[in-house]
Regions:
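Short, small-residue-biased leader/transition segments that mark boundaries at the very start
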Residues: 2-7
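Conserved alpha-helical substructure of the radical SAM core
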Residues: 30-57, 78
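Terminal RNA-binding accessory module
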Residues: 197, 205-251
Length: 251
């Protein structure tokens, strides 16, 4: 038991982003993706472990791309294996893009007990035309395959995603497709946001769904997600789970 600052820490392994999603301004603000060298990452991680950090939250705009700008190879799995040798209790991963989740990475997550089986994988949408318009490299079926592979190989996995309601090109048909996808894949956690155009992005130049309609769809998606989480919560009633105590209160 200790203070929150020494118990858990967000640990950035890269800066910037090279994904160029059509609705996102981050690449223009922060520049292209730049991985920190493994030597520097591990040196800082050792200091955090020695200081008493028990949960290390590995973050970047896209941690799955780690290392590809250094030598052209995905190095996240190798980095995680090294981090798991240090004195952390849990290692949590934010954020993974589905098209760069390799078999080696899945095996590493499944095999390393310190890696929390909770993966945050933002998909934005599932409709192929919308994904293509937003410069996403995924398709609905490629996303579905990644989710199925992860669930088949990682026991007790919980998935979280981020979804944008009312993206350009989303009509009622595409919206219902998104609702159905959520129901079918039973994604346990989801952050749902109405589309809001950002100046300087491709999406801002496209025809928009009216904001009030985007908000209505957001609320409907939240309802869908509430049903999914209720079902999940009922499925784990009676389970005994390990928790990390960050502090205590007189109350």
């Amino acid at each position: 038991v200790g203070s929150e600052m020494c118990i858990r820490d967000s640990f950035k392994i890269a800066e910037g982003c090279s994904n160029r999603c059509g609705s996102c301004i981050i690449p223009k603000l922060r520049g292209k993706y730049r991985s920190r060298t493994m030597e520097h990452v591990l040196a800082e991680a050792r200091q955090l472990a020695d200081s008493g950090v028990k949960e290390l939250i590995v973050i970047a705009q896209d941690i799955t791309r780690y290392g590809t700008d250094l030598n052209g190879e995905h190095q996240l799995a190798a980095l995680l294996r090294e981090l798991c040798k240090l004195d952390f209790h849990w290692i949590r991963l934010h954020y993974l893009y589905p098209d760069d989740i390799t078999d080696e990475l899945i095996d590493t997550i499944a095999q390393e007990e310190k890696i929390v089986p909770y993966l945050d994988i933002p998909i934005q949408h599932c409709n192929d035309d919308i994904l293509k318009a937003m410069n996403r490299r995924d398709t609905k079926e490629s996303i579905r395959k990644v989710f199925h592979d992860l669930r088949a190989r990682i026991p007790g996995l919980v998935l979280r995603t981020s979804i944008i309601a009312g993206l350009p090109g989303e009509g009622e048909k595409e919206f219902e497709e998104l609702c159905d996808f959520l129901r079918e894949e039973k994604i346990e956690r989801a952050g749902v946001f109405p589309f809001s155009p950002e100046e300087g992005t491709k999406a801002a130049t496209m025809e928009h769904v009216p904001m009030e309609e985007a908000q209505r769809r957001t609320e409907l998606l939240v309802d869908v997600q509430s049903d999914i989480i209720d079902e999940y919560n009922e499925s784990v009633l009676g389970d005994v789970r390990e928790v990390l105590c960050e502090g205590w209160s007189e109350e």
